[in-house]
Amino acid sequence: MHVNGKVALVTGAAQGIGRAFAEALLLKGAKVALVDWNLEAGVQCKAALDEQFEPQKTLFIQCDVADQQQLRDTFRKVVDHFGRLDILVNNAGVNNEKNWEKTLQINLVSVISGTYLGLDYMSKQNGGEGGIIINMSSLAGLMPVAQQPVYCASKHGIVGFTRSAALAANLMNSGVRLNAICPGFVNTAILESIEKEENMGQYIEYKDHIKDMIKYYGILDPPLIANGLITLIEDDALNGAIMKITTSKGIHFQDYDTTPFQAKTQ
C-alpha cells in the first residue's frame, strides 16, 4: 500500500512511539487522526505537527480506548471528518501490574475492539476499500517476563489475536491485512513506570532486575519503530507477520512453523 493520500488512525498518538508513527505517516503524505486520552499532550502534539505539516492533515480526538462507546465514536468522527479510513494503528498501552484489569482493558481488549471497528469500516464486504491494521505488541509478547506477568499476557494476546485475525481477514477476502510489531525496550514514558509502586505493585522490589534487563537488551528509539511500521504498510505481501525490533538485529521477523492443518490446505 502506498501511504500517500491515505487516512490513518493512531491510538496513543500524543507521545512516544505513537507520535513517531504519526510523524512518519505524515512525512509519507498521509492524513492522521491523533487519538489519545491525554488532552494536554494531544493538543501540544497537534500544534507541533501543525508547524511542520498543514493543519488539515491531522485531527486530534481525546479518547479513552478502554471505553467502548468512546472508541466507537472516535472511529465515526474520523471517517466523518476525513471521509475514509485506510490505516489503523492500535498503539495505546500501559504498564500496570497493580491495577491489572486496567492493563488488560487498554493493552488487549481495546486492541481487539479497535481491530473489529477497523474491519467494520475497511473490509470490502462492508463496502470499504480494504486497508491495513497494525497492532503494537512487544518482545514481552514472545517471551516470559517474571516481573510483568500481566503486561506479558496482554502482549502475548495481541500476537495470537493478530495472527488469527489476519488468517480470518484473508479467508473472508476482506482486503485488510493485519500485522503486529514486537519491539524491545523503547525510550518512552513506560520505562519510567517500573520505578513506581502504583504501577508495579508486588513486583516493585524486583525493579532492579528489570533495569538489568534494560541494560542487557538496550533501548530503542521511537523513529526506528516507525520505520518498521512503514515497512509493514508498504509491503502488500505481509499479512499475519510479527515484526521484531531489537538493538542487536534491528528490524526482522518472528519465524513460525506452519501448522499441520495449514500445510494440508495450502
Swiss-Prot record:
Induction, per UniProt: Down-regulated by cortisol, dexamethasone and betamethasone. Down-regulated in colon cancer. Up-regulated by TGFB1.
Residue numbers binding NAD(+): 12-20, 36-37, 63-65, 91, 151-155, 186-188
Cysteine-cysteine disulfides: none
Transmembrane portions of the chain: none
Keywords: Cytoplasm, Disease variant, Fatty acid metabolism, Lipid metabolism, NAD, Oxidoreductase, Prostaglandin metabolism, Tumor suppressor
Residues that bind substrate: S138, Q148
UniProt GO MF annotations: 15-hydroxyprostaglandin dehydrogenase (NAD+) activity; identical protein binding; NAD binding; NAD+ binding; oxidoreductase activity, acting on the CH-OH group of donors, NAD or NADP as acceptor; prostaglandin E receptor activity
Subunit organization: Homodimer.
Function, as annotated: Catalyzes the NAD-dependent dehydrogenation (oxidation) of a broad array of hydroxylated polyunsaturated fatty acids (mainly eicosanoids and docosanoids, including prostaglandins, lipoxins and resolvins), yielding their corresponding keto (oxo) metabolites. Decreases the levels of the pro-proliferative prostaglandins such as prostaglandin E2 (whose activity is increased in cancer because of an increase in the expression of cyclooxygenase 2) and generates oxo-fatty acid products that can profoundly influence cell function by abrogating pro-inflammatory cytokine expression.
Entry protein name: 15-hydroxyprostaglandin dehydrogenase [NAD(+)]
Protein's organism: Homo sapiens
